[in-house]
Amino acid sequence: VHLTAEEKSAVAALWGKVNTDEVGGEALGRLLVVYPWTQRFFDSFGDLSSASAVMSNPKVKAHGKKVFDSFSNGLKHLDNLKGTFASLSELHCDKLHVDPENFKLLGNVLVVVLAHHLGKEFTPQVQSAFQKVVTGVANALAHKYH
């Protein structure tokens, strides 16, 4: 990901204010509600029958935290996202067979959730930087696909 020093600083500063437990669960939950076809990858999560069921599902929250812990780690390695996410890319490609388009959808949902949580601090400049990051992460996760 090609970010200016200013963009890297803004991303790091605002990510430090994010409660990844909360944001991760909310972002994954929103993905499953807004794009219901993504639920097929989460059959073992139990009740995903309604928006309220998804958003209150403890397995969705737990997996969302796991996803965003990995995302947080990626923010420390912006110059090597492909390397950082290589094993996750392989897992999602070879074993889970996740459509790589879903990574882009999740990234866009994350931007919405960050805007909601950060309010006025989520300026257009910060949004632009985060959009570059989520696009870079989505591309890194899609890297192992043929």
Swiss-Prot record:
InterPro entries: Globin, Globin-like_sf, Globin/Proto, Hemoglobin_b, Hemoglobin_oxygen_transport. GO terms for biological process: hydrogen peroxide catabolic process. Heme b binds at H63, H92. The modification S-nitrosocysteine is found at C93. The modification Phosphoserine is found at S44. PROSITE patterns: GLOBIN. Residues 2-146 form the Globin domain. GO terms for molecular function: haptoglobin binding; heme binding; hemoglobin alpha binding; metal ion binding; organic acid binding; oxygen binding; oxygen carrier activity; peroxidase activity. Red blood cells. The modification N6-acetyllysine is found at K59, K82, K144. Keywords: Acetylation, Heme, Iron, Metal-binding, Oxygen transport, Phosphoprotein, S-nitrosylation, Transport. One of its GO terms (cellular component) is blood microparticle. Pfam families: Globin. The modification N-acetylvaline is found at V1. Belongs to the globin family. Heterotetramer of two alpha chains and two beta chains. Involved in oxygen transport from the lung to the various peripheral tissues. This is Hemoglobin subunit beta. It comes from Tamias merriami (Merriam's chipmunk).
